[in-house]
Amino acid sequence: MAELNVNIGNLPLKNPVMTASGTFGYGIEYADFMDISRLGGIFVKGTTIQPREGNDYPRMAETPSGMLNAVGLQNKGADYFAEHIYPKIKDINTNMIVNVSGSSVETYVECAEKIAELDRIPAIELNISCPNVKQGGMAFGVTTCGAGEVVKAVRRVYPKILIVKLSPNVTDITEIAKAVEAEGADSVSLINTMLGMAIDAEKRKPILSTITGGLSGPCVKPVALRMVWQTYHAVKIPIIGLGGISNWKDAVEFMLAGASAIQIGTYNFVDPTVSIKVIDGLNDYCDRHGFKSVKELIGALDIQR
């Protein structure tokens, strides 16, 4: 049996398989029918400093090989999370990581400070795909200045592991990755959803209330793989790969491209136990190929012809 443990900065994971924010609730919802402690980590749903109601319905749409969502970061706020959710998840025997969102640098900082007070939360994941209301709604993560500004501010107040989730809706994701690395990010996770749209031809109207939304699922996997591979060769901090992963083979591909760990997102809606199957599949793959540790896969892509 291969060793499956990996590290994200100073954060040890029992294996590289984690669930993505917004696709697995707070983890406890699945505890009755799967052993969630087997996971390398659980990224809990996006949290903001103030409660958010989310966008109007309809806010989800099925697409070929994927789905669009425009949920709008619906959550009850950081105080509610600390008082009501944290006590229920703090003793789960895996890494519980909070996805943090904001509408300004200040709200990111406030939320990060609140989560930092929770002893059993070892890391946060900054969602920098959120629009900056002070800059006309442009997402923080689409410019090096915007991404660097929010990471620098959060790094000042957040002493634990800081993971930054990168947007694919950019010209060169490696420049964004280098900018957040320079401002103190311990790791980057990529990719977030791609901007997409669905139209009802009969009604001649957009399907989503927000017109556009985030595209995820198997359709984005080739783009995600390419961006992970490019980023692996651009930064020194560890990469968490995500985007269209639905089985152990996908996970292996992301690790070969340079990911130290992976997140499973959309496929949790198809099979909530998929992450356990991926863990077992990774172990089998390593055994079949003679790898003593899953770490040997990281960046091991052979590009020679």
UniProtKB/Swiss-Prot annotation:
Xref: Pfam families: DHO_dh
Stretches assigned to coiled coil: none
UniProt similarity note: Belongs to the dihydroorotate dehydrogenase family. Type 1 subfamily.
Needed cofactors: FMN
Residues given in the record as FMN binding sites: 21, 45-46, 99, 127, 165, 191, 217, 243-244, 265-266
EC number(s) on file: 1.3.1.14
Official protein name in the record: Dihydroorotate dehydrogenase B (NAD(+)), catalytic subunit
Cellular component, GO, one term: cytoplasm
Cofactor note: Binds 1 FMN per subunit.
Purpose of the protein: Catalyzes the conversion of dihydroorotate to orotate with NAD(+) as electron acceptor.
Main location: cytoplasm
One example of a Gene Ontology biological process annotation: 'de novo' pyrimidine nucleobase biosynthetic process
